[in-house]
Amino acid sequence: MVLEANLIKRHHPPYNILLRDDKSYPYLFIETGHGTPRMSLHRGAQKGKGHYFGPYPAVTALRESMVLLQKAFRLRTCEDHTFHHRSRACLQFQIRRCSGPCVGHISGEDYARDVADTIRFLEGKSDEAIRSLGERMQAAAEQLDFEEAARRRDQIAAL
């Protein structure tokens, strides 16, 4: 026991394999089990329908990653109960971290594309995600929807 403690202190391993602190590692979970997927932090068994990314060695690193992903892709993080009973846009929408699918500020198709781009990015296919955003930016510019084109440009710059 003492030898193990000394080795841990000396080498600072990134993961404590035995999880002696009774915690499980956090994962980024994109829940795709219903029409409007959400992004959340998840610990424990991977039973939910969706995509798990991780494990992260520290929950603070995961929370920082989630904030950056919210700024870039604007996926919702609210619980389903809150999502279904919302009558006006939330604070996350006001500070531009959510696209507002709960109150209809984004179409279902566009939100699904944002989810797909997020998953591609997290799977390491960032070139595909950026290409997809570029195509959507061009399409918005051709339709003279310059606000949407600027939003997509900002997403690309964030990545």
Language model segments and positions:
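Acidic, glycine-enriched active-site microenvironments
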Residues: M1-L159
